[in-house]
């Protein structure tokens, strides 16, 4: 444990950014950008974020652009690290067999040279939306329908999670059964959401063929307009059980528990127990699903073909 903390603290506090090494990594990232530019799934995802949050940090690609990567300097990388990697913005998460007092003492000793950085104000993300189409000589069409969703603090957060699972997660979901199994309009379809501290998005992804797109879109919209109260108590109970299994399985993994604790503290300023999450999921009722549907599914904002 002591060696691990020593290595992490050294990386965070005393890293050097040699220009030659930076150029090597620059080349790797440029190749990665080129690789993703050839993947329709990646194009759709990046363009969706860009349209959802234009000219905002939330809408920018994690990889960056080729222009930025080519021009960034060692000083800029070091400045970024000193500005953002500071104690005010960090959580040190430990999970497993350890002595708490010893860990606290080690962290206090080893991280004394962390830069204090700035309390930069990051404005609240503002969802906008739009439309993007890209023609490519491919057999497949990737389509993403996105909506402004709820943030992680919303009263409808848990209901939205359950609704999304019932709607489009797995082979028993409504979208899979109605659109793939019954009509054969897609080879892949699912719904999901991204939940942040100040914003959220809800979306449906579909992979299909050129000939099926025209029929797919109205059928998909019809499914999204169906009242969520048409789900049964049995379906709701099974979905809740699915969440519980996922949570309990995650608890068996030390690394998963470590990441979960860190994320929970960053988002909620406390570590939430699995029992708390399960209790919230259990409290979701059928009428809550319709509230979640109405809140998340409003207007069609993005249609991407690649």
Where are these regions (language model features)?
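His/Glu-based metal-binding/catalytic segments typifying zinc-dependent metallopeptidases
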Residues: 117-174, 303-305
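M16/MPP (pitrilysin/insulinase) zinc-metallopeptidase core fold and M16-derived inactive scaffolds
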Residues: 4, 166-185
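Charge-rich, well-structured scaffold segments of protease-associated domains
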Residues: 1-118, 133, 150-151, 181-306
């Amino acid at each position: 444990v002591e060696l691990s903390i020593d290595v992490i603290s050294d990386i965070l506090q005393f890293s050097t950014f040699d220009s030659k090494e930076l150029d090597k990594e620059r080349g790797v990232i440029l190749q990665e950008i080129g690789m993703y530019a050839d993947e329709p799934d990646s194009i759709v995802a990046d363009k969706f974020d860009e349209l959802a949050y234009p000219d905002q940090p939330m809408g920018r690609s994690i990889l960056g652009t080729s222009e930025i990567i080519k021009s960034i300097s060692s000083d800029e990388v070091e400045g970024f690290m000193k500005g953002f990697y500071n104690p005010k913005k960090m959580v040190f998460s430990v999970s497993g067999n350890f002595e708490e007092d010893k860990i606290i003492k080690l962290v206090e000793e080893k991280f004394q040279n962390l830069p204090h950085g700035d309390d930069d104000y990051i404005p609240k993300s503002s969802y906008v939306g739009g439309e993007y189409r890209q023609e490519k000589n491919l057999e497949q069409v990737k389509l993403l329908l996105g909506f402004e969703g709820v943030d992680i603090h919303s009263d409808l957060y848990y209901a939205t999670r359950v609704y999304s699972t019932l709607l489009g997660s797995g082979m028993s979901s409504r979208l899979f059964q109605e659109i793939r199994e019954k009509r054969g309009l897609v080879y892949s379809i699912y719904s999901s959401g991204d939940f942040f501290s100040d914003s959220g998005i809800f979306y449906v992804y579909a992979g299909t063929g050129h000939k099926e797109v025209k029929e797919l879109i109205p059928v998909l919209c019809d499914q999204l307009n169906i009242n969520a109260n048409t789900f049964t108590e049995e379906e709701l109970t099974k979905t809740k059980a699915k969440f519980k299994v996922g949570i309990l399985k995650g608890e068996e993994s030390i690394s998963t528990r470590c990441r979960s604790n860190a994320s929970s503290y960053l988002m909620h300023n406390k570590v939430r127990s699995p029992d708390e999450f399960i209790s919230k999921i259990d409290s979701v009722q059928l009428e809550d699903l319709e509230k979640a549907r109405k809140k998340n599914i409003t207007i069609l904002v993005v249609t991407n073909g690649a």
